[in-house]
Amino acid sequence: DVYKRQGHIQVRGFAGNFLVVVKALTYIMTLGREGIPEAAKNAVLNANYLMRRIQGTFEPAFDRICMHEFVLDLSGFKKETGVSALDVAKSLIDYGMHPPTMYFPLIVHEDLMFEPTETETKETLDEAIRVLGEIRQIAEKDAQSLHEAPHRTIIGRVDEVRAARQPVLKYAFND
């Protein structure tokens, strides 16, 4: 029964999330037959470049050639400095960078998963390498400042435990 209420038809169950399919098809058609393999090669190249250049600052969880993503194991770094993967991710926000996936996969306990896209330039990747090196230096000198990151955003570090236990899903406007 596709009719939920009088005059309303539910399409999602039939066609899935239609706009996701449209975006994927648009991307495929834009790249074309030659562009798709090239994009895949660029994603793999970017991930391996970033992983090898970060090595020494932070260690990869798996020291081998990766595909389009790689995981950094920060457990030794945390023991050494007291700075967690969460602290590093939040610190990246202060540099205008979107933080990577945190604490996934679950088989690595203090990890960050980086997935540089196929469109990232060498300059952008080099900037990420520089920033991660700077965060490493800050951690060795002033770990407390990283525990409080981000500093340059309107809202500072969110209490994630409180947010999960007492979610506020609407904004209270002052009338």
Regions from the language model: what does each represent?
Residues 2-3:
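Short, small-residue-biased leader/transition segments that mark boundaries at the very start
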Residues 6, 11, 28-175:
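Non-catalytic terminal extensions of PLP-dependent enzymes
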Residues 12-23:
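PLP-dependent aminotransferase class I/II
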